[in-house]
Amino acid sequence: MRRRARSIRFSSDDNEDNEEDDDYYSNAHSEKSEDHSNHIKVSHFDPSSYKQKLVSVRETQRNRKFSSLQKHLNTETPSFSVSIENPSKPSAAFNDASLGKKSTEHQIDGIRNGSSNLQMEGNDKELDTDNNEDESTTFKDEEDDLISPKSYLTSSKTFSYPKAPTESTNGDYLDEDYVDGQSDPESSNASDSDFADSPDDLTKVRSPIPSRRGRRKRKMRGPILPVKKNLRVKKAMSPLRAERNSPDFRRKLRSRDNRPNYHLFDYYNEIASSPNPSTTKITYNPPKLPMKDFATLPIGYQSTCDSDETSELSSTSSEQTSDVEGLNAYNNLGASSDIENAPSSQLHFGHIDEKTIRSTDPFANRENLDFNSIGGLEDIILQLKEMVMLPLLYPEVFLHLHITPPRGVLFHGPPGTGKTLMARVLAANCSTKNQKISFFLRKGSDCLSKWVGEAERQLRLLFEEARRVQPSIIFFDEIDGLAPIRSSKQEQTHSSIVSTLLALMDGLDTRGQVVVIGATNRPNDLDPALRRPGRFDREFYFPLPNKQARMKILEINSLHFSPKIPESYLLHLAESTSGYGGADLKALCTEAALNAVRRTFPQIYTSSDKFLIDLNEISVSICDFVVASEKIAVSTRRSDVKPNIPITDSHKILFKKSIEVITSKIRRLLKLDVYLPTVESLQKLPAEELMRQKEINSLKTTMSFRPRLLITDIYGYGCTYLSKVLFSMLDGIHVQSLDISELLMDTTTSPRSLLTKIFSEARKNAPSIIFINNVEKWPSLFSHSFLSMFLLLLDSISPLEPVMLLGFANTNQEKLSSTVRSWFPSHRSEYHDLSFPDYSSRYSFFHYLLKRISFLPIHQKSAEAASVDILPKVLPVSKTSDLTDKVNRRQRKNDKKIKNKIQVKLSSILEMLRSRYKKFKKPIIDLNDIYIDESNERVVKGKSKDNFEYFLSGNTVTRKKDNACFKMMNFEEIERRLWSGRYCTPKEFLRDIKMIKQDAILSGDVNLKHKAKEMFAHAELNVDELIDAKLLYDCCQVSKREKAYKQLKQKKLNNAKDAHEMQESKNEETFVRNDVAQEDNFIELSSNEVRNVSNDEHKHTLFHGQSLTHNNLIAVTPPSRTGVEHKEENKKYDNVNIQKTLAKCAEEFAEHTNFNKVELLDFVYSKLSSTIWENREEHDLLKIVRDVRQTFFRSLEDMGV
């Protein structure tokens, strides 16, 4: 309606009237109280005030003609209301008090011939009240078809017609192109079918609508109602349509004297009495998200609602607003709703297999995805195969026996012991050729959601999908985050998730052939309901690897190292890495390999460019493992397990005898040396023999009675060192530490609860050891109630249970308190008093230190300043060398096509140049005028050297008088280069053409010079026209690849040549060394005589050992090496003397260190180590020995010994 008012207002030429109309329009617009983005509005105004403003307009509109019905009526203009609440029923009605008594036929003619402001939507006619029969018809209180505010609520249109006019209006104003009785097809096509009734409905109503006369109706619509064309209603185009659409057609606007009156009436009562319109409901069914995109999400699109029903959008506004809302709804909610309601078969749910693992991990290979790649867990692998593979592959066995197979297993243990690795290998190897097993890998956080009920729904869908594709395996990593212990302090959301998981694992509905595996580092934090048969039937404990397991893990991770690491060093490394987990050992091997790369190619760490490196030069040595062991931090430092911190090798040598004695006692008390036959060997026995063997084996559980061991250290003989080294010697025994610092370290946990937890873990993992250090200080540090609780827990252990109490005391047994002595009764406990290391132990202790002097000197500065070889850089285009052979062949084939294309185009250009510029077919300078050196075969006879103006200088020809250099380029040479593949780009072709031009310029011939420039210009022009940008770019890439390929090929040839020469030199040295040993069979020749032997004879001699003239063998006398041999002999003599001197020093130190205190030995040991380090660059080893002896005796003086 705003557009109609604006268009009518702009049609006037009077500025004063325009200002009045603007005032009215602004007032009417400012009174709109509600947003009209979805509904139609009506503006109210005061008729009296408007009457005063538009007096001039009403006075000029007196020549209008009204319909006969309007002339007959003397009352106010009747109101015509059209409701769009139900388009299927007639909604046109007149006010009965305002209707005349004209016949229905006249009314129908008025409807068909006239027009109103209502746009018929979905039909083929429009009514317009602005077009009247005569331009001289006067309006009294005329109003426009603006809508009242009540229509915003009822979605109806109200129209009113002018009051009865005067009879002085008889003139007709006709449009030139107007045909009476014919509606405008353009307006008929642009209809809004969703908001208006059909014209047939209007024919049933007595309506005094004037016939259409006057100006052509302009196609308009309301400011809110969208134009929705009904494709089913189409009429033939009017014959005047084309003329009206022509640019020469000019609309006939209304003049100033026939402008309408914009006076409006209040139709609030009429609109309020009309029925409420029905709601138009629009349901959006957006297309579903492609499942290929959905599969990449963690577990599907997180829904924004809690319901599983499809979201629907409703709108009571226009269709245009609904379209926008529908689009936003699809972006925000529609896709989510479709994904929620998608079938479970289309969801991803973390389904992985060997192919998925390889696609996500580019470094994964077949060997890394095999059970053989897991070391030290052979027993667990066997049980896992029995539990997982047997029910899935052979379900008929359990059906025959009417038993339920175990369908749940829990992995628990310290971090880095192979729990997740086991799941990855199981996912890659669980399926066979005959049986496909699905594997679902989920993490605890994947199933959680901020929406209430969403996590439970995801779990339900996961189990439904696993049941659908059974047999299947579901692996929950870090399951303690998904199913923690339910308590009153916990949120109800987590309790609901745990309850849902419990019901899904073992509820009323069976889950079929679905095996559930959980992994956690904290099994005690899991809900107890999960840890029962039916849910998690078995629990596999992944311990820290023992010595044999560490050896196996190191062998697996260093299998591809070159050269192969010696087995003796791997054994030593396995002994020194006590307390390392599988992940720590793998990180150790990785760090050693990276250190080898850093040592071999330090250039790659100082530049961002890529270099050409030879991978065969990388060699991992023992020194790389030594450096790597200093960088690796062990991750298995847990509060409930005593860390296995190894001591130095020198202290192991010092306490070797004491360690052996204590270890033997522990094994004897816990009966660790008792051999039991394996299960495989027992299965082969008959039933009776098996029962007898079982009865004998049961004796082991009754052989140990409350094992106790107390180790006392009166004079500080090294109790602290022994407490560290013992656990590295007792691999496979679970150790719980009751150290004072560990009991008091955690402020959030009371010592009593920690004490209860330690005893519980020790009894669960029997045979085990409860270790107490500084046991003599417990009565003074802890309260009586705590000590009583400790004694109560100690007595609660079964007498025959293999749980040992091991105590270390820094005093003798008599000085211990009665409380501590009660823990170690004399009749059932073992005692061991530590003694000071004897002479042999002290000698080995000091000799181990002094041996390091023989490794000196170390030139640290020279090593840092050593020169680094320069590596060749890899060109950016050399990535093709890294491609596979198949891709590389395809690339070379495409490059050949591009080169053929450029050759054909350049050959056409060259043919044109040859036909037009024949002077450049041969070189500019005649070959007979060039002097050639006499050593060459081509010598021009009959002329002296001074008679030649040009002479040959390398690859160019030089003129004698001015030393001008000619390239001697010509078309024949260019053609030869073209078809030999020398030109990869047009630039190279133009470069040779330019050489011809340069030679012509140097020749001095003006005509030849101009022709050469013209020829070069033609060549450039033809190259630009025939070769497009894409082909030019492809040619440049081909040229780069060709250069990189040639460089790589040349490098390989050089490397092969160097390797061949090195191998020949080695063969020659080997031949000479082997033959010189048999001097009787050789005729010795000096080095000068050997040089005179011909190459063939010398080569034949080297390979066959025979000369061409002698039948005896020929050998080459090596040069004199008397000086070198003398130095080596002196060095060997010095080493022997140094070793003897060091042994004497060790004996001397062992004799003078009978201190009865290990702490004093450590003091002397540290002083000697400092002295050796300070002299690390000294060449005179005897001087270092003298300084060490002086330091030793000075330390004894400082201690007062």
From Swiss-Prot:
Phylogenetic classification of the source organism: Eukaryota, Fungi, Dikarya, Ascomycota, Taphrinomycotina
The keyword Magnesium belongs to this UniProt entry's keyword annotation: no
Annotated compartments: Nucleus
Recorded GO CC terms: chromatin; nucleus
Record's protein name: ATPase with bromodomain protein abo2
Source organism: Schizosaccharomyces pombe (strain 972 / ATCC 24843)
Basic residues bias: start-end ranges: 212-221
Pfam families, per database record: AAA, AAA_lid_3
GO biological process: chromatin remodeling; nucleosome assembly; nucleosome disassembly; transcription initiation-coupled chromatin remodeling
Biased amino acid composition, Polar residues: 66-89
Family: Belongs to the AAA ATPase family.
Gene: abo2
Ranges of compositional bias, category Basic and acidic residues: 29-38
EC number: 3.6.1.-
Function: Probable ATPase which may play a role in nucleosome organization.
SUPFAM superfamilies: P-loop containing nucleoside triphosphate hydrolases (SSF52540)
Main location: nucleus
Keywords: ATP-binding, Bromodomain, Hydrolase, Nucleotide-binding, Nucleus
Reaction it catalyzes: ATP + H2O = ADP + phosphate + H(+)
GO MF assignments: ATP binding; ATP hydrolysis activity; ATP-dependent histone chaperone activity; chromatin binding; histone binding
UniProt domain Bromo: residue ranges: 897-1026
